[in-house]
């Protein structure tokens, strides 16, 4: 449960004794791995009980616990290793994309759609949620228009719906293997972002409500909810404050 993808993405390894084969240099970057809620889920196709289904309204892939008999076909067939077999309940479990929050069931947002728990709790503000088929969505801009957010291992053929902005400091060949042939192009755009791209990046982690559309102004970006109500307003360029010498945290 803790690390089903261990060593799948890592580049470092122990040096063998006796003889030494050519190995690439060690590097590290953090890659959060969650269920991709694929358009063509391998887990769904593999389940002999038809216990896995994809919700048409939002694309969330779920396991019907009442139908699952613990055959573990989904565990075997998912290329991302996200369904896991629970030894206590004897059924498979996986990320549910916090669908209750998407439905507006959380009282914190007064019935408005809310982002998932992993997004709202992320202190690094590295995640953003939205609908990729809506041209007004910031996610649509990142994936379809600017093409800086790419799917993980697109060669698996499941059409995953979690997208990543590739890191700049990892070897390019490795990134092409993970994110496809557009990895270098995405890094180039992200390294020197346009005004609109920089604005959209400021929406990451800026609100717990789902941002359906946005508007970019000269100095700030505004995020709107489903009914075009404003849910967040953030500056595009964060102010830099230089502290006086007597307040510097140095010895």
Predicted features and spans:
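Non-ligating segments of multi-cofactor redox enzymes
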Residues: 1-251
